[in-house]
């Protein structure tokens, strides 16, 4: 927990129990691309009494401080992941909401070449590729209205 205290202070944030608990949940291995609602449910499951409004507020503070990265994937729901040192892109299933992170040097090179050809010095970018799971039919158990809920890492 000392590392989390240091990380919060380094980001210019006061160390509070809600911030520490939310950071702790975000560090769990299965909690990549988690929504505020799913994070809140996980805290409740852990017996923590942190309100949903506090979860939203802390996630916004973490986003502003660079601790988390906010993604707005198809479906309109913001999801958060701890900010990583290495750049990666995302594949997203439109049916079940599964998110796959990947890196491809040839794609990165091509994007820089295109930007340069148009006189742009690339400083950052996001690449989201949307499709449907190729193996099996994830739609049998996931309807479009529940795809994000069913993709929760807290199932």
From Swiss-Prot:
CDD domains referenced in this protein's UniProt entry, alphabetically: Fur_like
Record key words, sorted: Cytoplasm, DNA-binding, Iron, Metal-binding, Repressor, Transcription, Transcription regulation, Zinc
Predominant localisation class: cytoplasm
One of the record's GO cellular component terms: cytosol
Region (Dimerization): 85-155
Any Gene Ontology biological process: negative regulation of siderophore biosynthetic process
Keyword ATP-binding: no
Entry's Gene Ontology molecular function annotations: DNA-binding transcription factor activity; transcription cis-regulatory region binding; zinc ion binding
Stretches for region DNA-binding: 1-84
Residues that, per the record, bind Zn(2+): 33, 81, 90, 93, 96, 101
InterPro entries (alphabetical): FUR, Fur_C, WH-like_DNA-bd_sf, WH_DNA-bd_sf
Record Gene3D superfamilies: 3.30.1490.190, Winged helix-like DNA-binding domain superfamily/Winged helix DNA-binding domain
Subcellular compartments: Cytoplasm
A matching Pfam family: FUR
Binding positions for Fe cation per the UniProt entry: 87, 89, 108, 125
Entry similarity comment: Belongs to the Fur family.
Cited function: Acts as a global negative controlling element, employing Fe(2+) as a cofactor to bind the operator of the repressed genes. Regulates the expression of several outer-membrane proteins including the iron transport operon.
NCBIfam families in UniProt: PRK09462.1
Subunit structure: Homodimer.
Listed PANTHER family: FERRIC UPTAKE REGULATION PROTEIN, ZINC UPTAKE REGULATION PROTEIN
Name this polypeptide is given: Ferric uptake regulation protein
Source organism: Klebsiella pneumoniae
Phylogenetic lineage: Bacteria, Pseudomonadati, Pseudomonadota, Gammaproteobacteria, Enterobacterales
């Amino acid at each position: 927990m000392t590392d989390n205290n240091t990380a919060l202070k380094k980001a210019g944030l006061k160390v509070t129990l809600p911030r520490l608990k939310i950071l702790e949940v975000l560090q769990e291995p299965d909690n990549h691309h988690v929504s505020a609602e799913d994070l809140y449910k996980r805290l409740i499951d852990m017996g923590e009494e942190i309100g949903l409004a506090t979860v939203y507020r802390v996630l916004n503070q973490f986003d502003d401080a660079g601790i988390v990265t906010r993604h707005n994937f198809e479906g309109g729901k913001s999801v958060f992941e701890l900010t990583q040192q290495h750049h990666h892109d995302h594949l997203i299933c439109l049916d079940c909401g599964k998110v796959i992170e990947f890196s491809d040097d040839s794609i990165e090179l091509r994007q820089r070449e295109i930007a340069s050809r148009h006189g742009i010095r690339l400083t950052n970018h996001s690449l989201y590729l949307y499709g449907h799971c190729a193996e099996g039919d994830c739609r049998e158990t996931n309807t479009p209205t529940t795809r994000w809920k069913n993709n929760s890492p807290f199932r």
